[in-house]
């Protein structure tokens, strides 16, 4: 942490008391009736409303990631493509079945792979490179197992070969896609290395929710940062 120099050791200590394997994952289950998978419900009610992003899809394609076909649906041409921020590409891929295949598809809330990514970063910040690499590989292996049902040791070995903060956080971003955690990671680390939408007014990626005009007008003393 940029604020607390002891945060890495604390994160390591706490994480070692948490999930010990994929079987310990905290999962939200859905009965498929009135209680449906939220991504499924969203997509079912708004078919074609939201496409996959170009950055994420290209990242998986370029890495030949085994989770690609699970995370990303085929596009109109039978391949995998995403929309750039400034584009309205109706032919781009949509969410894959891993997230919203059926009304009863479960969602992972906290995973063993997330714990291992936390440990990988903590070890890296503590200068323990070999332990960081081992934790990073375990995190990737666990994520692939969660998503595909199989292991891919060769891919995980290659993906964990570079022990840098950027690679750790980028791999974590892939594994935790659709969760809020990668946004927090990006705000505190700057990774993954994203390019802001140059068609936007600010040409910057927001780092917090924008305060509405009514709030700034009626409660100005509490909204001076906006």
What are these regions (language model features)?
Residues 144-146, 155-226:
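C-terminal functional modules
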Residues 4-119, 125, 133-175, 180-183:
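Hydrophobic-face positions in mid-chain alpha helices that act as interaction patches
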């Amino acid at each position: 942490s940029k604020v607390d120099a002891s945060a890495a050791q604390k994160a390591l200590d706490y994480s070692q008391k948490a999930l010990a394997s994929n079987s310990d994952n905290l999962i939200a289950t859905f009965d498929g009736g009135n209680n449906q998978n939220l991504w499924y419900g969203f997509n079912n009610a708004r078919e074609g409303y939201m496409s996959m992003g170009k950055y994420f899809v290209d990242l998986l394609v370029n890495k030949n990631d085994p989770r690609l076909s699970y995370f990303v649906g085929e596009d109109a041409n039978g391949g995998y493509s995403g929309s750039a921020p400034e584009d309205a590409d109706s032919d781009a891929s949509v969410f894959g079945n891993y997230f919203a295949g059926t009304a009863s598809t479960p969602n992972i809330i906290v995973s063993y792979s997330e714990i291992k990514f936390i440990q990988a970063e903590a070890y890296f910040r503590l200068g323990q490179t070999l332990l960081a690499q081992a934790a990073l590989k375990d995190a990737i292996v666990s994520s692939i197992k969660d998503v595909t049902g199989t292991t891919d040791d060769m891919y995980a070995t290659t993906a964990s070969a570079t022990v840098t903060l950027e690679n750790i956080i980028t791999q974590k971003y892939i594994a935790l896609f659709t969760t809020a955690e990668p946004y927090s990671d990006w705000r505190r680390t700057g990774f993954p290395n994203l390019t802001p939408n140059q068609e936007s007014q600010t040409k910057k990626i927001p780092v917090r929710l924008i305060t509405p005009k009514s709030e700034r007008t009626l409660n100005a003393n509490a909204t001076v940062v906006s």
